[in-house]
């Protein structure tokens, strides 16, 4: 870089010195700027050289860690291939190298050179996962007997496994809740998860049905892997009849894929410790169509019926859903009496509708008349719909 020549000199010696000093400062600033650019470009060049070096490396094998022998050696398996005792590269973080971890293996030496992220289907990550549900036993009315049985099967093994060891029995691996829709099966499962400080994973059976061969089975496997990672965990499979129906000898391609998914579920349940930190609860309103293999001991070996609530149950449910409502002159016993055949979900809808009637009339309290109109709207509309369906079937078959 050269200093610009100028034909016009400042008048006087002092002015010329000042001019030169200013020019020197400008050039020094330019030098510092160029040096900074040089350092930046050298760093970029170094990064690109490293990137080129990595790109020239031969591809690595992907595998799984079977067992970590010591700080320098581990047993690995290259997917469905033979097992090898291999070296562990010194830069690998030992605390993250655990059985089941996915790793990259050097093509020539089979040494572990990189830890890979866990492989999970996006569908698994899309399941409803609640670290700790907010539902408590006080939020459930009319199911004291069923809650007691569920707590014995799920809560006791997680909180007091030593009791089963002392008695010498194995706790149930899974619990099947069966009964009409809207009777509190999901709420019961969430309440148990809350009281044992467990992660709650809810999946609907139909979400495990996949189009392509093996996808459903892989999804089930990854569901249980996710549960083990977040243990203690309660897996709640709603509408399990979607994958757990009785198997037939003659099946179509789609039915065979559903059967593969069921077989994977059975294998997963057979493969974990009943005294471990993963419990399975399933729900269905069609227990009659379930495959007998699901219900044998060691799988869903505790069956709990969750029926429609009786009068006392309906009264307890109404108390739960109205405890935060501003009631005036409401006799819940009358409402419980006239709602025979209603489910817990129906009773919750009745309480909500009664509140809506009060809001519609610009009131801050709910009356008995609001509840009577709500009963007619919720229960009456269901009966009218059932009558219309029955009439349609009679007329059109």
Curated annotation (Swiss-Prot):
GO biological process, one term: protein unfolding
Keywords: ATP-binding, Chaperone, Coiled coil, Cytoplasm, Nucleotide-binding, Proteasome
SUPFAM superfamilies per record: P-loop containing nucleoside triphosphate hydrolases
Cellular component GO terms, alphabetical: cytoplasm; proteasome regulatory particle, base subcomplex; proteasome-activating nucleotidase complex
Record flagged with keyword Plastid: no
Location (main, coarse): cytoplasm
Coiled coil region boundaries: 15-58
Keyword Coiled coil applies: yes
UniProt xrefs under CDD domains: RecA-like_PAN_like
The organism's place on the tree of life at top rank: Archaea
Gene3D superfamilies: 1.10.8.60, Nucleic acid-binding proteins, P-loop containing nucleotide triphosphate hydrolases
Record-level Gene Ontology MF annotations: ATP binding; ATP hydrolysis activity; proteasome-activating activity
Record note on domains: Consists of three main regions, an N-terminal coiled-coil domain that may assist in substrate recognition, an interdomain involved in PAN hexamerization, and a C-terminal ATPase domain of the AAA type.
Function text: ATPase which is responsible for recognizing, binding, unfolding and translocation of substrate proteins into the archaeal 20S proteasome core particle. Is essential for opening the gate of the 20S proteasome via an interaction with its C-terminus, thereby allowing substrate entry and access to the site of proteolysis. Thus, the C-termini of the proteasomal ATPase function like a 'key in a lock' to induce gate opening and therefore regulate proteolysis.
Protein name (Swiss-Prot/TrEMBL): Proteasome-activating nucleotidase
Source organism phylogeny: Archaea, Methanobacteriati, Methanobacteriota, Thermococci, Thermococcales
